[in-house]
């Protein structure tokens, strides 16, 4: 391979890396209800992902992953989801109550 070909491949890789870095940038942190809600949903999703990963590790026979660890992670995920659903229900009921108030 010639030096020019290597340099062109290197430039292409650098351009792709810059493009990938610009796509992967997280949104700036915002304060307020919406950002708190997004953070809470993100935490619920993370517990689900952790439980799924632990179950896959157990299924594949990864050393150090026991059945009780999998069950605990699955219960944590289930409880987090139930809490999220209940919070959503309370927020929806509160919103409906506020919308029904007379001014």
From Swiss-Prot:
Under the heading HAMAP family, the entry gives: FliE (MF_00724)
Q: Where in the cell is it found?
A: Bacterial flagellum basal body
Q: What is this protein called?
A: Flagellar hook-basal body complex protein FliE
Q: Which residues form the signal peptide?
A: none
- Keyword field: Bacterial flagellum
Q: What is the lineage of its organism?
A: Bacteria, Pseudomonadati, Pseudomonadota, Gammaproteobacteria, Enterobacterales
The Gene Ontology CC terms held by the record are: bacterial-type flagellum basal body
Which organism is this entry from?
Photorhabdus laumondii subsp. laumondii (strain DSM 15139 / CIP 105565 / TT01)
One Gene Ontology MF term: cytoskeletal motor activity
Listed under GO biological process in this entry are: bacterial-type flagellum-dependent cell motility
Would you identify the family this protein belongs to, as annotated?
Belongs to the FliE family.
Determine the domain of life of the protein's source.
Answer: Bacteria
* InterPro entries linked: FliE (IPR001624)
């Amino acid at each position: 391979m010639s030096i020019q070909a290597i340099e062109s491949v290197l430039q292409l890789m650098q351009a792709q890396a810059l493009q990938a870095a610009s796509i992967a940038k997280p949104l700036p942190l915002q304060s307020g209800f919406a950002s708190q809600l997004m953070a809470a949903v993100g935490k619920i999703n993370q517990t689900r992902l952790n439980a799924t990963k632990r179950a896959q590790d157990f299924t594949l026979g990864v050393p150090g992953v026991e059945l009780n660890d999998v069950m605990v992670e699955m219960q944590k995920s289930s409880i987090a989801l139930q809490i999220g659903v209940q919070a959503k229900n309370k927020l929806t009921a509160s919103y409906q109550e506020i919308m029904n108030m007379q001014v």
